[in-house]
């Protein structure tokens, strides 16, 4: 059975902005998803954020849709239910978006969240992995 991992938005941003400090590890996370070694998940709100950023970077709506199509071939979008939103609201978290993502990840049985922003998720009782920690788990030994 393939491991279900929630992929935080910053992983995508690293790849599409070619962030020199993080691009290789973040790209490796998405490659694990593309190779079906892990199942990668995100939320619809993250997808809208990603599309906006890609379109802004590329200055080309059609190219942004092509990139988004590729993402959607390797990442699945989790449902966000009314119950998820209510549960996240009840937390009164400092970062509501991270709280809602963690709530969705847990509700959909993701085993971990891969993120560079571990402090944003530390209070939500779900395993957190840096991109390098996740990639290291799947390196041939």
Locate predicted features.
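PIN-domain endoribonuclease scaffold, especially VapC-family toxins
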Residues: 4, 27-41, 45-92, 99, ...
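Short, well-structured N-terminal submotif of metal-dependent ribonuclease cores
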Residues: 1-42, 56-62, 123, 135-141
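Alpha-helix/helix-capping structural signal
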Residues: 10-11, 45, 83, 119, ...
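Acidic active-site catalytic centers that drive phospho-/nucleotidyl reactions
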Residues: 8, 98, 117
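Acidic, PIN/NYN-like endoribonuclease modules and their adjacent C-terminal/linker elements
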Residues: 1-4, 28, 74, 103, ...
